[in-house]
Amino acid sequence: MLMRTCDIRFYKKLQQPQFSENGEVYSHKCQAFAHDGSGGEFVLLEDGSIGLISSEGSVGRVADRLDDLLTFLVNGANIFDFSYTNLYKNKEVLRTFCMAYLKKMRNEYAENRSDWDEIHGALAKKLSVPFTPENLPELAETFYQAATRIPTFICSYKDGEKDYTCDSVLSDIFPRWIGTLLQMTKEDFETLSHK
């Protein structure tokens, strides 16, 4: 149920990240404790915070504590749906996005004759984390603060003679689906988010 609802499945024990066999160097010591549906891994960092090494090559801290991550996921968030940095430049824009996002999720569940609140609420109870979807904007802000906290969690690697750094879990590329959800163009969104 956790994988289907929150896109996370725990390993039986801590292990080396699967993305450590090609000379990847992580800025923090880490051990994988879970994976997502696409093969990315959640890792416990040496300072106790939580990182994500995605299967698409992005890397970053996503929570300061495991409870923060689980609360964020249970209350409706997919990490990558909340990775657009301009969402966080204006609190009203973030709130508007979060409420539209929750409405979309509830509607998708209803189309499948399921109750989003009932399913996620039961899971929150089972995990002993708060179920407060109305606080999703604050939970998203907590995610953003963890992702941008210095020192950030990054990965570098060599390809031949060149050094590379993996992309961050945060992105400044405007996801088209956000514009569709909020019924605005990229330009409209950016104008609003910078007010």
Language model segments and positions:
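Compact, glycine/acidic-enriched structural inserts
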Residues: 54-93
